[in-house]
């Protein structure tokens, strides 16, 4: 049986966004190996049929010794597994596993799930990462991108020319994220679903919550996600939670019940996204989305039809769009969500994404 190795940085992301791909690969059939740090979703991935290779590393770590250990671990896994095709996601697997696959002449497919702060910019770290990407993707068979801005960035840098392909993000599972009836009764509720960190726009969300509740005091602003250790606004955040201005639920396994009770998802991110899964999932459930007018976010919304686009890092603009939504009749808010669901069905069905990957893997293994 042919072997496919998937290298990624986070078990929750692999399970939540690529479970359907794994199911399709196993059914094909391929022997599926996964290399990533241990976590609570690993047992479920094993139950699906994946063979787990623990690969401990810190996603944001910059210790050279730790990075060398990771490269050595990846090399041992390649020796042990002898995969026919490797799929890589996120920066460190893309860079290190990509370079090793190129050296070992193993076909590999790289996915750019967003530039990330280590790539976007002009600093020394960004220049080094871009240089490493050029080396890592030199022999990539396919380079998948989730938005045109990211693809253009790599094209302008001359990275993996001629092998770029576009995907509608990770897509969205339209069965799990099914349409949810609109909550016509009770106070309007807004939802922020993300890691609590500056780049995800939490400060703008807090600013908007304060401003909106002065005019509409019954409005609910809820937050789902874990609090990043290095978030500098922790003191203000905790104070606003204690005052009841926002409601913090922490990290939850299933966001659907929270989306069901909300009227709109707010995602004011200025993080270099590939394609915002938060926006896709919320729209699939039939909820309006307010998000930033930047790559990875703007593609998920038809401005004024399925939600609103706002300027990056602009609390006043975000507040104005939330106010505009609140001043719409209930029927128009509901219709905005229904149109979002239709948009997801036509353009972002995860089955589209799975087919792209499966076609690439089948083609590469057939050539061997």
Regions found by a protein language model. Give the residues of each.
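Short hydrophobic beta-strand element within catalytic cores of glycosyltransferases
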Residues: 288-291, 301
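Acidic donor-binding loop of glycosyltransferase active sites
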Residues: 260-274, 287
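Donor nucleotide-sugar binding/catalytic pocket of nucleotide-sugar-dependent glycosyltransferases
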Residues: 134-179
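A short, well-ordered alpha-helix in the C-terminal region of glycosyltransferases
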Residues: 218, 317, 324, 331-347, ...
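Nucleotide-activated donor-binding/catalytic signature segment of Leloir-type glycosyltransferases, i.e.
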Residues: 234-252
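Conserved acidic donor-binding segment of nucleotide-sugar-dependent glycosyltransferases
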Residues: 302-304, 308-315, 324-330
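Conserved donor-binding/catalytic core segment of Leloir-type glycosyltransferases
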Residues: 181-200, 206-209, 222
């Amino acid at each position: 049986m042919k072997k496919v190795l998937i290298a990624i940085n986070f078990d929750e992301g692999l399970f939540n966004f690529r479970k359907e791909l794994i199911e399709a690969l196993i059914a094909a059939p391929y022997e599926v190996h996964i290399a990533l740090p241990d976590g609570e979703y690993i047992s479920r991935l094993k139950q699906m049929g994946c063979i787990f290779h623990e690969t401990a590393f810190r996603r944001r770590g910059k210790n050279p010794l730790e990075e060398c250990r990771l490269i050595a671990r990846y090399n041992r896994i390649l020796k042990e597994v002898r995969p026919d095709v490797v799929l890589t996601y996120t920066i460190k697997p893309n860079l290190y596993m990509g370079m090793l696959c190129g050296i070992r002449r193993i076909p590999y497919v790289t996915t750019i799930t967003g530039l990330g702060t280590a790539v976007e910019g002009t600093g020394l770290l960004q220049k080094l990462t871009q240089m490493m990407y050029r080396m890592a993707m030199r022999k990539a068979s396919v380079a998948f991108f989730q938005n045109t801005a990211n693809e253009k960035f790599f094209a302008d840098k001359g990275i993996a020319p001629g092998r770029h392909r576009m995907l509608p993000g990770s897509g969205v599972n339209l069965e799990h994220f099914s349409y949810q009836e609109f909550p016509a009764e009770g106070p309007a509720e807004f939802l922020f679903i993300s890691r609590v960190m500056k780049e995800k726009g939490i400060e703008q969300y807090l600013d908007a919550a304060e401003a909106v509740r002065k005019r509409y005091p019954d409005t609910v602003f809820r937050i789902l996600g874990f609090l990043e250790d290095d978030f500098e606004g922790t003191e203000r955040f905790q104070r606003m939670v204690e005052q009841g201005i926002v409601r913090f639920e922490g990290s939850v396994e299933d966001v659907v019940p929270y989306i069901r009770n909300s009227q709109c998802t707010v995602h004011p991110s200025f993080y270099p996204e590939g394609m915002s899964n938060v926006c896709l999932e919320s729209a699939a459930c039939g909820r309006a989305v307010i998000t930033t007018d930047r790559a990875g976010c703007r593609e998920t919304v038809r401005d004024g039809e399925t939600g609103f686009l706002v300027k990056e890092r602009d609390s006043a603009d975000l507040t104005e769009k939330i106010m505009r939504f609140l001043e719409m009749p209930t029927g128009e808010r509901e219709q905005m969500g229904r149109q979002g669901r239709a948009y997801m069905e036509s353009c972002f069905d995860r089955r589209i994404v799975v087919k792209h990957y499966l076609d690439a893997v089948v083609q590469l293994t057939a050539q061997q």
